[in-house]
Amino acid sequence: MAKVSKRVAANKAKIERTKFYPIDEALGLVKGCASAKFDESIDVAVQLGIDAKKSDQVVRGSVVLPAGTGKSVRVAVFAQGEKAEAAKAAGADIVGMEDLAEQVKAGNLNFDVVIASPDTMRIVGTLGQILGPRGLMPNPKVGTVTPDVAQAVKNAKAGQVQFRVDKAGIIHATIGRRSFDDAALKSNLSALLEALVKSKPATSKGVYLRKIAVSSTMGVGVRVEQASLSA
């Protein structure tokens, strides 16, 4: 353990907080500083050139990461009839209507994503106080309220991540695990950044992607030189 601690400490000492590193070097430093015994997530923080206080500049959406997230996701779906059967065939873990709503009200939230067909929102809408604070409330902006529930299930299982800008104008997202190779992490980061650019508010002026930093679950943030992302 002492050797591991010394290695991690040495790697942390290499990081200059104000320096912007080429993406390959940044990922190497992040992995080198990952000291937890579990497979830490690799996270990204993107500072956007927006005014998060303005309602027309709230950036929100979702993207399917090409290399996945490295996490097994349980999906619950509110649907009935043919759509319910399609959701089950697509791999949904829980499918229901009033019965599923009762499970939620009872505190049985054994799922990571909730998807709803538009015609079920009369039921789902009553669960806002439970699902909302947990980030589970279905929303058309992130593709979780949709007529095509089967495709939404497939997206969730394939590694779809949702993003929403915080009050400081920063997007936080996970782009993989420490065990991922750099190519997988870079492809996921590129997909996320592309989705963010597509979600740029029309009223946003100036530089949009201002700063990008990567980190591990228990590690420090490393700033990324944006020019290296297109190299």
From Swiss-Prot:
The keyword Repressor applies. Keywords: Repressor, Ribonucleoprotein, Ribosomal protein, RNA-binding, rRNA-binding, Translation regulation, tRNA-binding. One of its GO terms (cellular component) is cytosolic large ribosomal subunit. GO terms for molecular function: rRNA binding; structural constituent of ribosome; tRNA binding. It holds the Pfam family Ribosomal_L1. GO terms for biological process: regulation of translation; translation. InterPro entries: Ribosom_uL1_bac-type, Ribosomal_uL1, Ribosomal_uL1-like, Ribosomal_uL1/biogenesis, Ribosomal_uL1_3-a/b-sand, Ribosomal_uL1_CS. Binds directly to 23S rRNA. The L1 stalk is quite mobile in the ribosome, and is involved in E site tRNA release. Protein L1 is also a translational repressor protein, it controls the translation of the L11 operon by binding to its mRNA. Part of the 50S ribosomal subunit. Belongs to the universal ribosomal protein uL1 family. This is Large ribosomal subunit protein uL1. It comes from Cupriavidus necator (strain ATCC 17699 / DSM 428 / KCTC 22496 / NCIMB 10442 / H16 / Stanier 337) (Ralstonia eutropha).
